[in-house]
Regions:
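Juxtamembrane intracellular "pre-TM" segments in multi-pass secondary transporters
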Residues: 1-3, 181-215, 237
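Helix-to-loop junctions at the C-terminal end of transmembrane segments
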Residues: 55-68, 151-152, 259-273, 361-362
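Hydrophobic core of transmembrane alpha-helices in multi-pass small-molecule transporters
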Residues: 14, 83, 93-112, 218, ...
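A membrane-interface helix-boundary motif in multi-pass transporters
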Residues: 149-169, 359-384
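C-terminal ends and interior cores of transmembrane alpha-helices
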Residues: 78-91, 282-296
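Multi-pass alpha-helical transporter architecture, strongest
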Residues: 87-88, 171-182, 347, 373-412
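Helix-loop boundary and gating motifs at the non-cytosolic
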Residues: 2-49, 209-217, 221-249, 318, ...
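Cytoplasmic helix-loop-helix junction between adjacent transmembrane helices
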Residues: 101-135
Length: 412
């Protein structure tokens, strides 16, 4: 195939996920600077979950059927970038939330449209999409580096607004770049949301192994998203990392993700679905346990080092989950089944994490403003252990391992 097109699609994915990565790690450090109440922080932090649910049930299908992919991307990122600028320069809650929500409602559908555009223009998607998708992970890593120079070691709210401004700048760049992508017309033959397929996918929950995997995915999605709710504040205080290095430190996990994804196929062949997923959840348990028991500045090096566990947490559970659905579920409902699990990962799990962990953090913060991170991080540690036990005892898939593993999950 044309390597120029493949590189364009790779660069498209770099820019796409860089927008998301620009604000994700630091937003829960920024909102307290604006004196938002806890429920307001929880609600604003749940923007992505709200937009994901809307996207899964409406806007993704609307975009697919009515717009050429490249024009939809250009328009969405142009308006979304303007919305991020609005969020950066407002300091009262409601205008901030409305700008941030508008950005989310425009941005979330572009993730699916990006994937659709890539699949439509790759000669061999099974072979080439992994390379394109890796661009998203690289984008998440690269976007943290400008913040080292734009933020201070102890940033003010005025400095911290750069997390949105960087995202806005990338949005504008991607809006223009999208118009250079291959023309991909709307799929007018698509019938929107296949309600029968979704119903069949939900009915699969009657099968014990599917129900167990569904519950475990909800648990793991909650603690995975809880990491992003808590990590910024944890690294800032008590670990005492400079504000401008926090995002860069967390990208160690994305570097590890690239390495782990390269190992995933051989690991699945050797130990199968169940044990690969158990190891993925074990990564969460170990990471949160380290956070709980070593929550002091003198353990900075250890806290930085365990960020590599993100690669195991993500690839060995979430990427394996998507491969499992593609390999085991009936062909006619695989897309709906993927959407069902996406609803947990990007929607319900994220929503629970923002409200629950945000509320627990407020509850376990002293009058002097000191957070009991030991108690706080024991919660996801214990949940991860419960999820591992559930998989170990009750997850009995129809096949032990894939014949030819190979698939790609959404970047995060």
């Amino acid at each position: 195939m044309n390597n120029g097109i493949r590189f364009k699609l790779f660069l498209m994915m770099v820019l796409e996920i860089a927008i998301w990565g620009s604000w994700q790690v630091q937003i829960f450090n920024y909102m307290p600077m604006l004196n938002f109440e806890q429920w307001q922080q929880n609600l604003a932090g749940s923007m992505f979950a709200i937009a994901s649910v809307v996207g899964i049930f409406f806007s993704n299908q609307f975009a697919d059927r009515n717009f050429s992919a490249e024009k939809f991307l250009a328009t969405s990122h142009l308006i979304g970038g303007a919305a991020l600028i609005g969020a950066a320069f407002t300091t009262s809650f409601m205008p901030f939330f409305l700008c941030f929500l508008l950005y989310g409602l425009l941005y979330v559908p572009t993730i699916s449209v990006n994937n659709a555009l890539a699949f439509a223009n790759l000669k061999d998607p099974a072979r080439d999409f992994g390379f394109v998708r890796m661009g998203g992970t690289i984008g998440w890593i690269v976007v943290s580096w400008p913040l080292i120079f734009l933020l201070g070691a102890k940033s003010t709210a005025q400095e911290m607004r750069w997390i949105f401004l960087v995202g806005a700048i990338i949005s504008f760049v991607l809006a223009g770049f999208s118009l250079t992508l291959p023309h991909t017309p709307p799929r007018r033959d698509v019938q929107g949301l296949d309600k029968l397929a979704w119903l069949k996918a939900v009915k699969l929950l009657r099968r014990p192994y599917v129900f167990v995997l569904f519950v475990v995915t909800l648990i793991d999605s909650t603690i995975h998203n809880g990491y992003f709710v808590l990590i910024g504040g944890f690294l800032k205080d008590p670990i005492k990392m400079p504000d401008n290095w926090i995002a860069a430190i967390t990208t160690i996990g994305q570097v590890a993700e690239i390495v782990t994804m390269l190992m995933l196929g051989s690991v699945l062949k050797k130990i199968g679905w169940k044990w690969t997923m158990i190891i993925g959840i074990l990564g969460h348990a170990l990471r949160f346990a380290v956070f709980a028991f070593f929550d002091k500045p003198e353990y900075q090096a250890l806290i930085i080092a365990v960020q590599v566990l993100h690669g195991i947490c993500y690839a060995f559970f979430f990427a394996t989950l998507y491969i499992f659905v593609d390999a085991v579920f009936p062909k006619d409902i695989r897309t709906s089944a993927q959407g069902l699990f996406n609803l947990l990962v990007l929607g319900v799990g994220l929503l629970i994490a923002n409200f629950w962990f945000g509320s627990l953090k407020a509850q376990w913060t002293s009058a002097a403003g000191v957070v009991d991170y030991h108690k706080l991080f024991l919660v996801p540690t214990e949940l991860a252990v419960v999820a591992m036990v559930m998989l170990l005892l009750f997850f009995k898939p129809p096949t032990d391992r894939p014949e030819e593993p190979g698939a790609s999950a959404p970047a995060h």
